[in-house]
Curated annotation (Swiss-Prot):
Homodimer. The RNAP catalytic core consists of 2 alpha, 1 beta, 1 beta' and 1 omega subunit. When a sigma factor is associated with the core the holoenzyme is formed, which can initiate transcription. This is DNA-directed RNA polymerase subunit alpha. GO terms for biological process: DNA-templated transcription. Belongs to the RNA polymerase alpha chain family. Gene3D superfamilies: 5' to 3' exonuclease, C-terminal subdomain (1.10.150.20), DNA-directed RNA polymerase, insert domain (2.170.120.12), RNA polymerase, RBP11-like subunit (3.30.1360.10). The N-terminal domain is essential for RNAP assembly and basal transcription, whereas the C-terminal domain is involved in interaction with transcriptional regulators and with upstream promoter elements. It comes from Methylobacterium sp. (strain 4-46). Keywords: DNA-directed RNA polymerase, Nucleotidyltransferase, Transcription, Transferase.
């Protein structure tokens, strides 16, 4: 149908490359190409805004410091005033596996630095920047603090973090929940066949370590996908009935299943895609050595794939006579119910 050409005939990106940064758990550059002219800016801007505003994270929302009534106080034996201490507390990076508010405590005696690593946490909370300096204590000085940690998204100012029944001395803190700290993107020209008028989108994502850059990008894309679904106000025409199945295949029909249906991690799936491994039949003919030569493909991804294949009774390095078959896409559709 003519209507379907609106989306079916557009160029779709078929290459996604993840380049780890100086700290792979926090920084990565993701390159997607080719894109229709203008789509690089459209997608890059949308992904950037969602990455910075809409991902869930954890942050300190309030603090109570023994002997302190308000944030404009000073503490005997502590070189920083309370305002500076609160500013430092705002930058504590936290990973929390619970949606419920949690408490953390800190108690330390001088002299010396007080760091985020001195905070006592419970099992499902982790401090990601333990070297962060909160304040400095003189000889004989002591400081005790109790923090409230909550989960949310985006930026929430301190006045919205003050409970209605807040006790005297509770200091609300500006909360930056987003695990993404910085996002930038650039658009370059790229080639699609003989056509040089296509976009290449390069995005650099930095996080606080609570989530990997590539996973953060995947979550942002899913958010956009879900938000746009309501605008699709039509059903696509049903495809014609499939032709009768062939009586026999010379290999397991499961080999016709696409690897992107295996529910692999984002990194493993991207590595297979960049190596043009589309079907399970393509994958199992690869040896372990060949897989490890794939860019950005490590031992962790290898073990993950081996486990998934083993659950299907398959393994790497298999010999599959008759692979790949002719009309593989048609065969995959016809035998879909068999796997």
């Amino acid at each position: 149908m003519v209507i379907q050409k609106n989306w079916q005939e557009l160029i779709k990106p078929n290459k996604l490359e993840v380049v780890p940064g100086h700290d792979p758990k926090r920084v990565a550059t993701v390159v997607a190409e080719p894109l229709e002219r203008g789509f690089g800016t459209t997608l890059g801007n949308a992904l950037r805004r969602v990455l910075l505003s809409s991902l869930q994270g954890a942050a300190v929302t309030s603090v109570h410091i023994d002997g302190v009534l308000h944030e404009f106080s000073s503490i005997p034996g502590v070189r920083e005033d309370v305002t500076d201490i609160v500013l430092n507390i705002k930058t504590i990076a936290i990973r929390s596996n619970s949606d419920a508010p949690k408490r953390m405590t800190l108690r330390k005696t001088g002299p010396g630095l007080v760091t985020a690593g001195d905070i006592s946490t419970i099992g499902d909370i982790q401090i990601l920047n333990p070297d962060l300096v909160l304040c400095t204590l003189d000889e004989g000085a002591e400081i005790r603090m109790e923090f409230t940690v909550a989960t949310g998204k985006g930026y929430v100012p301190a006045d919205r973090n003050r409970p209605e029944d807040a006790p005297i001395g509770l200091i609300p803190v500006d909360a930056l929940f987003s695990p993404v700290t910085k996002v930038s993107y650039r658009i370059e020209n790229t080639r699609e066949g003989q056509d040089l008028d296509k976009d290449k989108l390069t995005m650099t994502v930095e996080t606080n370590g609570a989530v990997s850059p590539e996973d953060a990008l995947a979550y942002a894309a899913r958010i956009i996908q879900d938000q746009l679904q309501i605008f699709v106000n039509f059903e696509e025409p049903r495809k014609e009935e499939a032709a009768p199945l062939a009586p026999q295949l010379p290999f397991n029909p499961a080999l016709l299943k696409k690897v992107d249906e295996l529910e692999l991690s984002v990194r493993s799936a991207n590595c297979l895609k960049n190596d043009n491994i589309v079907y399970i039949g393509d994958l199992i003919q690869k040896t372990e050595a060949e897989m490890l030569r794939t860019p950005n493909f490590g031992r962790k991804s290898l073990n993950e794939i081996k486990e998934v294949l083993a659950a299907m009774g398959l393994h790497l390095g298999m010999d599959v006579p008759g692979w790949p078959p002719e009309n593989i896409e048609d065969l995959a559709k016809r035998f879909e119910e068999h796997y």
